[in-house]
Amino acid sequence: MINLRQQIPHYLRLMRFDKPVGIFLLLWPTLWAVWIAAKGAPSFKIAVIFIAGSVVMRAAGCIVNDFADRHLDKHVQRTQMRPLASGSVSVTEAMLLFAVLSLIAFTLVLLLNRLTVELAVIGILLALVYPFLKRFTHLPQLWLGIAFSWSIPMAFAATVGHVPAVAWLLFFAAVLWPIVYDTQYAMIDREDDVKVGIKSTAILFGRYDRLMIGLLQGSVLLTFGLLGWYLRFNYWFYLGLLVALGLMCYQQFLIRHRKPPDCFAAFRNNNWVGFFIFLGILLTYRN
């Protein structure tokens, strides 16, 4: 018999509510899209649905990820105490929790138009496939970027009824960004991942990891600059990009010796990159 009160802390850890930075990394691209699609004046309903949906889907994605990795996580020092790997949460409990979260997410999306619902189905499939890719390809971070950015076409579909070209330009920038921060994250476990057969961009890039991260960071900022020019954004947006550039340079400084704590700090610092880009968008529409 499950003691629900005792299990709640384990459920919260399974959904990573003890590590909220992941929620924000998913939320920032969503907010970029919601604000740009509505030209700075999103409806309260759409904003709430997408914010709540980001929180719920991130939690559901963490459960799927831990389910897929439950046998591998036992062999990686950083992950061996995750609830499924350690046995503090059973597979049955995890799947029931995933079903509840999926039902909540599906209920939220049903409040939007048909195109958004159809795009949401694709988004769910992207999220379900991602955790299993690290066994077969060194590019799971690319798939993560697509999955994490799928809220962008959804936000435009919900707001304007279609997905215009500008949405795909924003989508491209947003896809590149998770490759940056998840490569930094994968650098933490690189040695353990090689031992257990997990693949990642950190392993693929090898000694060129900092160079590749830098090229990707530059591509993100360049694409955002093109987006700002296309939408005729004012100087506030470019000030936001300038701060983001400074933060990315700081991340390069942090990972220069590739020490796990510093790589983790660089990963977490990306929350501020997303925030200042959003702040630039917000101030652009207010001035």
Swiss-Prot record:
The keyword Magnesium applies. It is found in: Cell inner membrane. GO terms for molecular function: 4-hydroxybenzoate polyprenyltransferase activity. It is a multi-pass membrane protein. Keywords: Cell inner membrane, Cell membrane, Magnesium, Membrane, Transferase, Transmembrane, Transmembrane helix, Ubiquinone biosynthesis. It comes from the Bacteria. Coiled coil: none annotated. Its cofactor is Mg(2+). Belongs to the UbiA prenyltransferase family. This is 4-hydroxybenzoate octaprenyltransferase. The gene is ubiA.
